[in-house]
A protein has these predicted regions:
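Long, low-hydrophobicity, solvent-exposed regions enriched in small/turn-prone and acidic residues
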Residues: 1-146
Length: 146
């Protein structure tokens, strides 16, 4: 199960939004409760619309894991104390480019540095992402308006 508390965004200055959040997540990996992961977490996020073409953001999330992590590799928490920051440049009303960086706050390593081109295709969104740290490409198509 999962629960989160937050609030309406605070507006510290023009075109900026800031919010705190905190929550608790509990995952059961066996029907008899044999493997349980408890994870309280908290964080803060700020985003700023600089102008019509540029958005910036930054945030911090801390996941306080107990002694038991997920038994499944796809469900592991990679960065328990994580800084995220980046920005989006809106090239046209249908095209934008974003840089998103995820940094491990414990050791300072940049774990992800993703450059994404997004195109609005009316009923679909197309995303082409270059993951610079992993040196891989990812393409994603998302249906909308259905």
């Amino acid at each position: 199960y999962y629960g989160e508390l937050s609030h309406d965004a605070l507006k510290p200055w023009t075109n900026a939004n800031f919010r705190f959040f905190g929550g608790y997540q509990r995952d059961f990996y066996k029907a008899d409760g044999g493997v349980v992961r408890s994870m309280p977490y908290w964080g803060a996020r700020i985003n700023q619309k600089v102008n019509n073409r540029l958005d910036l953001w930054a945030g911090y999330t801390q996941r306080n894991l107990g002694s038991t992590h997920s038994p499944y590799p796809f469900d592991e928490v990679e960065i328990p104390k994580e800084l995220t920051y980046g920005g989006t440049v809106h090239l046209t009303d249908k095209d934008d480019v974003s840089l998103n960086i995820r940094q491990n706050a414990e050791n300072g390593n940049i774990e992800y540095k993703n450059l994404t081109y997004h195109r609005d295709l009316h009923s679909f969104d197309a995303y082409f992402t270059y993951k610079a740290v992993q040196k891989t490409w990812e393409m994603k198509w998302t249906a909308k308006d259905f």
